C-alpha cells in the first residue's frame, strides 16, 4: 500500500452506473486503495453527471489526478466492465508514483 504524502497529487476514482444495470455492478470499486473513492454515481438519476463526464456506456470508472481526468475504464457493449480491479489499481499506483 502506498502512503499518501501531504503536498503531492490527489488521486480520485469515480464510478458511474445506473440502477437498471445493477447486475453489472463493480463490487470491488470501494476496495481500491490509495485514492478517494466517491461511491456510485447513478446516471439514471443524475443526468448532469452523465453529460459533464461524457458517460457513453456503463459501468465506467474515471481516474482523476488533481481534478483532471487521466484514465477511463468502460464496459463493453454487453455492459460488463472489461478492466479488472488489478488494472484499475495499477493505474492509480502509476499516477501516484509519477510524482516521484
Report residues per predicted region:
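Local sequence-structure signature of Cys/Sec-based thiol-disulfide redox active-site neighborhoods
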Residues: 7-39
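N-terminal signal peptide c-region/cleavage motif recognized by signal peptidases
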Residues: 2-4
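Structural motif
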Residues: 6, 50-53
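Short, glycine/charged-enriched secondary-structure capping and boundary segments
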Residues: 27-30, 55, 76
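N-terminal post-signal-peptidase region of extra-cytosolic proteins
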Residues: 43-50
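Non-catalytic, surface beta->alpha helical segment in thiol-disulfide oxidoreductase systems
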Residues: 63-100
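Structural micro-motif
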Residues: 53-64
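Soluble periplasmic/extracytoplasmic beta-strand elements of cell-envelope proteins
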Residues: 13-15, 60-62, 72
